[in-house]
């Protein structure tokens, strides 16, 4: 990992993250191109920091006042954050969130909506995917591209597809009134940039999902954004939608980072709406796959997805990180004609967009990835210890 992890305009970006400090635990930090600055004087957790009114202004003022002491060099810490180079005595970047719920919206792009239907029709069997894809596209074609979810037009299309035997639970959440919102991972369980990401060892058909992740506080205010990899098991979910939890939530199966960029005069939700994500997968055997996902093609506005995830009917007192979904659904053959894409151990996955930087992870299986051991209790113990020593 290097300075390419930072946004292209890092000199003006307001980046917050979490730093693992040996002997002390997790610190909430601000990250500049040169330094990693301690924000403990403002908040002890990322969740608490994002609760502050006018958080971007508060963080800038705190840094400008000189109260945020330097904890580490940004370049050195990025290098140490690579799991292959990490040492116990060195500080490294964790996932930037902590106590927040980690939620995700699914089936928010037409391209990935069709792939979910294909998985369902193929019953999770990758060898059947290409034949099913041709059959599904022949019936549905481009009929979904201009449909507004929940509209009268979407209701009419549903009736047509029901009559043709092509209606699907994925189309219901894709173009119906209610978005799919699910729990991607538990608070504190996400891994950061440089960490290993885990695939369930029983999966034979899986893929990365490059996504924008919004950071919202308990009031439902979206205050920043990050990058995420919603690691997905296509075969598990394809066999049954009731296996969504097993398909999505495994050890190290959720990556977020490298940082949360706070909204300010230089970066806003309108910039998020126009983000183009790039994906690069480099396999140990020389396989290369590239893809992209354009937020401008999303079928539901990002703020609408936030309002469907939290509100008067569902509160998150510690805030929420929300994956927005992806239009990327890989079909490039890797192991033979018609087999499509699946991960192998050792794949390096890079997800990037200019204003948020680059999230980089290597693939292993969830049973071999470092186990999740640093939870809420451990964090509270570390914070109490630091408080007693101050």
Model-based region annotation:
Residues 1-14, 22-25, 232-390:
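Catalytic-pocket segment enriched in acidic/His residues
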Residues 19-24, 32-33, 219:
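Short, flexible beta-strand-to-coil junctions
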Residues 26, 31-66:
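N-terminal cap/recognition module
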